[in-house]
């Protein structure tokens, strides 16, 4: 008869460190993951305190990494801010992260539009509206969209 080996459950701190070794997490995201794994809230608080103290958990570093990741996906500033807000990263941390990760949002919007629409300018209002909606969904402002879709751009 074969018995399946089940490894002993790791303690909360080790699990947190293991999660953070794979990629940066925000405080809220890490807390959610540890809660889902069934750890007690006092163990989670203790593990998070340890990770913060030792620099393993850093919301600013996490926010900057999220900005780089989303820019790589062709997302605009508004979309990125919304995603960080959903992950409960504080407004001040988000502001600092954007200050430390400067982007040319106008050129990014233009690049995304060129890639998506193959440089083809909309000939009809309906097509233009479709292009605008796409770029809005991606998180670009109206000024950035106008720049990206401008014939002279």
UniProtKB/Swiss-Prot annotation:
GO terms for biological process: regulation of DNA repair. The keyword NAD does not apply. Pfam families: RecX_HTH1 (PF21982), RecX_HTH2 (PF02631), RecX_HTH3 (PF21981). Its main location: cytoplasm. It is found in: Cytoplasm. Belongs to the RecX family. Modulates RecA activity. This is Regulatory protein RecX. It comes from Vibrio vulnificus (strain YJ016).
């Amino acid at each position: 008869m074969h018995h399946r080996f089940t490894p002993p459950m790791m303690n909360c701190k080790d699990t947190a460190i293991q999660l953070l070794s794979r990629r940066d997490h925000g405080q809220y995201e890490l807390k959610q993951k540890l809660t889902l794994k069934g750890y007690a809230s006092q163990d989670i608080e203790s593990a998070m305190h340890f990770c913060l103290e030792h620099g393993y958990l850093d919301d600013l570093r996490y926010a900057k990494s999220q900005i780089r990741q989303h820019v790589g996906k062709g997302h605009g500033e508004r979309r990125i801010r919304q995603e960080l807000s959903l992950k409960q990263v504080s407004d001040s941390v988000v502001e600092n992260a954007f200050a430390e990760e400067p982007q040319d949002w106008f050129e990014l919007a233009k690049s995304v539009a060129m890639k998506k629409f193959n440089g083809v300018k909309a000939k009809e209002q309906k097509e233009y509206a479709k292009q605008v909606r796409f770029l809005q969904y991606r998180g670009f402002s109206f000024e950035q969209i106008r720049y990206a879709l401008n014939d002279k751009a």
